[in-house]
Amino acid sequence: MSPQTETKASVGFKAGVKDYRLTYYTPEYETKDTDILAAFRVSPQPGVPPEEAGAAVAAESSTGTWTTVWTDGLTSLDRYKGRCYHIEPVPGEDSQWICYVAYPLDLFEEGSVTNMFTSIVGNVFGFKALRALRLEDLRIPPTYSKTFQGPPHGIQVERDKLNKYGRPLLGCTIKPKLGLSAKNYGRACYECLRGGLDFTKDDENVNSQPFMRWRDRFVFCAEAIYKSQAETGEIKGHYLNATAGTCEEMMKRAVFARELGVPIVMHDYLTGGFTANTTLAHYCRDNGLLLHIHRAMHAVIDRQKNHGMHFRVLAKALRMSGGDHIHAGTVVGKLEGEREITLGFVDLLRDDFIEKDRARGIFFTQDWVSMPGVIPVASGGIHVWHMPALTEIFGDDSVLQFGGGTLGHPWGNAPGAAANRVALEACVQARNEGRDLAREGNEIIRAACKWSPELAAACEVWKAIKFEFAPVDTID
């Protein structure tokens, strides 16, 4: 940082460039149960000591600015300031540190993810004294989490609404994602639902384009839901994407979905924004709608290891803002997702209490104090050969979503859905019999092919499809 340059006014006021360490680096501080705790990966500029960098992060994300100001004397900075209370080097890195910052609860508006992020991941990420900055994790105290509604319904309520127990749920994103007419789109939904899937889904960028306006899509998809329910005797759903250019338009679409009597709507929570998402989540709880969340834009924020924000933080924020499902990677598919890291934030989405576990990237113990859980959705480049691994990795409380892995079946959409349903039922039965899905998965799928020609055809098509790239974001 710049050297201390001070001038003394006649009343004793000192102005100049601050040395942040003097005020915001407090290694003796004992954190409170009510503090929001943050773990930042800090990469200082050459010549900036880690204590100064960590203190600068604490200052610029709470009460501080670059100089001393007159109005500092009009409040209690000790009560409101963030504190960098611990620093540790990142293993294998010469110029990176994990800096732990504690924020007093009074800095944040109740029930507002928007306000929380505006402070913690605001202007500080452009601070010149840092080459890079990444928020790795947050500890949300029960005192603060209790000010949020959280998911509209949660895992158990969703199962009760759908009357589906003891297995993962199956979904399919309709493809091509853009260009279909509303009627053809609804036809594809019907075929997939009739074939055995629980859900079909709007792609994240399907909103209301010239080739398919939202109201037409909603009507044809509702027809597909009711027709497939009548034929199969199962409750079905389609994630109707309510994301829009304004909150008012988003709510108009959600209201129309409720009037159609469908069970679930959808929102792109990062591009749509946390304020819009929380508004929609409150409406969904009040009106009995499930809420599916897509994380479009997340990789812009979370994929680089040195800068941005880890997805586990975005996952916690979503649980607070509200959503019943969220896309969470696949481990085995085409999208980024290292196994232990993915399992770490899957637990943060579903469980009531999660212990600190650095081996899975969890920096803090998190107690959600009975806030409803969120179902993780595995989607992206998966097919029937992945079913044993997905069932073993994600367990029953998950949605396994096959887009191309359903619609790419050589015999059509309904046979593609049937192949996925047979593969899932075979894996669940084998698991319940005590078989090892990780070791015997391929054998289980081959055995099921003998009595399901649809599955046999799918296995032949996708037998050589793999996405074998090393993940970018890994445990240190």
Curated annotation (Swiss-Prot):
Free-text remark on how the cofactor is bound: Binds 1 Mg(2+) ion per subunit.
Binding sites annotated in the UniProt record for Mg(2+): 201, 203-204
One MF term in the entry's GO annotations: ribulose-bisphosphate carboxylase activity
EC class: lyase
EC number: 4.1.1.39
Classification via Gene3D superfamilies: Ribulose bisphosphate carboxylase, large subunit, C-terminal domain, RuBisCO large subunit, N-terminal domain
Cofactor section: Mg(2+)
Keywords (A to Z) from UniProt: Acetylation, Calvin cycle, Carbon dioxide fixation, Chloroplast, Disulfide bond, Lyase, Magnesium, Metal-binding, Methylation, Monooxygenase, Oxidoreductase, Photorespiration, Photosynthesis, Plastid
Classification via CDD domains: RuBisCO_large_I
Record: active site: 175 (proton acceptor), 294 (proton acceptor)
Feature type site, description Transition state stabilizer: 334
Sites of N6-carboxylysine modification: 201
Catalytic activity: 2 (2R)-3-phosphoglycerate + 2 H(+) = D-ribulose 1,5-bisphosphate + CO2 + H2O; D-ribulose 1,5-bisphosphate + O2 = 2-phosphoglycolate + (2R)-3-phosphoglycerate + 2 H(+)
GO CC aspect terms: chloroplast
Residue positions, PTM N6,N6,N6-trimethyllysine: 14
Record's comment on post-translational modification: The disulfide bond which can form in the large chain dimeric partners within the hexadecamer appears to be associated with oxidative stress and protein turnover.
One record GO biological process: reductive pentose-phosphate cycle
Residues annotated with N-acetylproline modification: 3
Alphabetized PANTHER family for the sequence: RIBULOSE BISPHOSPHATE CARBOXYLASE (PTHR42704), RIBULOSE BISPHOSPHATE CARBOXYLASE LARGE CHAIN (PTHR42704:SF16)
Note in the entry: The basic functional RuBisCO is composed of a large chain homodimer in a 'head-to-tail' conformation. In form I RuBisCO this homodimer is arranged in a barrel-like tetramer with the small subunits forming a tetrameric 'cap' on each end of the 'barrel'.
Subunit architecture: Heterohexadecamer of 8 large chains and 8 small chains; disulfide-linked. The disulfide link is formed within the large subunit homodimers.
General function of this protein: RuBisCO catalyzes two reactions: the carboxylation of D-ribulose 1,5-bisphosphate, the primary event in carbon dioxide fixation, as well as the oxidative fragmentation of the pentose substrate in the photorespiration process. Both reactions occur simultaneously and in competition at the same active site.
Family: Belongs to the RuBisCO large chain family. Type I subfamily.
HAMAP family linked: RuBisCO_L_type1
NCBIfam families: PRK04208.1
Name of the protein described by the UniProt record: Ribulose bisphosphate carboxylase large chain
Source organism phylogeny: Eukaryota, Viridiplantae, Streptophyta, Embryophyta, Tracheophyta
